[in-house]
Amino acid sequence: REHLGVFCRFFLFINLFKLPFSQSAGIITGLITQNVDRLHQRAGAQNVIDLHGRLDQVRCLSCGHTESRSHIQNWLEQHNTLPSLTSVTLRPDGDADLPAALIDDFQTPHCETCGGVLMPDVVFFGGTVPAERVQTCYRMIDEAEGLVVIGSSLSVYSGFRFCRYAIQQDKPLIILNVGQTRADELCLHKFDDDPFSTLSQYVAQLDSQTPERQHV
C-alpha cells in the first residue's frame, strides 16, 4: 500500500470485466467487494459497495472529511525531500532503512477542514466496518434473489456475516472459490473451481442463450 503510484497503474485483471457484463445482462444487481483498489469500478461495474474502504482516499479521524490520496501525495512531495527509489533498498514488506535526519524532518499533512489526523480510508486488520456501510450491504441483499460469493475464503467475518444474513433471509447462497471457505456448510451450491475459467464459460453461455434471470 506504500506504492500507490505503481499500484494504481496495474492493468485490470480481465476477470473483473465479467461481472459488469453480467450486470448489463440483468443477472447481477450489485457488488459487495472486499478489495480497496476500485478496480471493479474501473472495469465498468455499477452499484458497488467498497466494504473495506478505498485506497485512493484518505479520511480525517476527527471530522470524517475525505481527500484524494493523490492530493496528499502531491503535498508530501512538495514539502519533503524524498529519496529516489534507486538510492534505497526496499525490503519485501515495502519498508526501507532511511537516514535518521530524513525521518526527523519529515512533514505530514493534516486535515484541511479541522487540522485533524489523516489515515487511508480503508479498514485495516482489527478495524471495524462502519455500521452504515454494513446496513447498506444488508439492504442490497434484501433486494436481491440470492447471494454469490466469488474468489473469497470468507475467513474474515466482515464478509462472512453476509452469507449468514442471506441464509437467515431464505436467500440461496452460491460459492465459487478454489479451496475451502468458511461458509461451505451454509451454501446451496459450492463450485471448487477457478473463478476466471468458470466466469469466462458463463459469459460465453450468456452470449449464446437467454437464461432465466435471477437478481444476485
Where are each of the predicted segments found?
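Conserved catalytic alpha/beta core of Sir2/sirtuin-type deacylases, generalized to analogous enzyme cores
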Residues: 1-216
